[in-house]
Amino acid sequence: KIKEKLIEA
């Protein structure tokens, strides 16, 4: 999942 990546963007 990339969701966890964009939340830290």
From Swiss-Prot:
One Gene Ontology cellular component annotation held by this UniProt entry: extracellular region
Keyword Secreted: yes
Keywords: Cytolysis, Secreted
Primary site of residence: secreted
Top-level taxon in the UniProt lineage: Eukaryota
Location of this chain's protein in the cell: Secreted
GO terms under biological process: killing of cells of another organism
Expression across tissues: Expressed by the venom gland.
Function: Presents moderate hemolytic activity at physiological concentrations (micromolar range), and weak lactate dehydrogenase (LDH) release from mast cells. Does not induce mast cell degranulation, and antimicrobial effects. In vivo, injection into mice causes moderate edema formation, but induces very weak or no change in nociceptive sensibility. It also causes an alteration in rearing (standing on hind limbs), but does not impact locomotion.
Protein name, per record: Cryptide Pep-5
Organism: Tityus obscurus
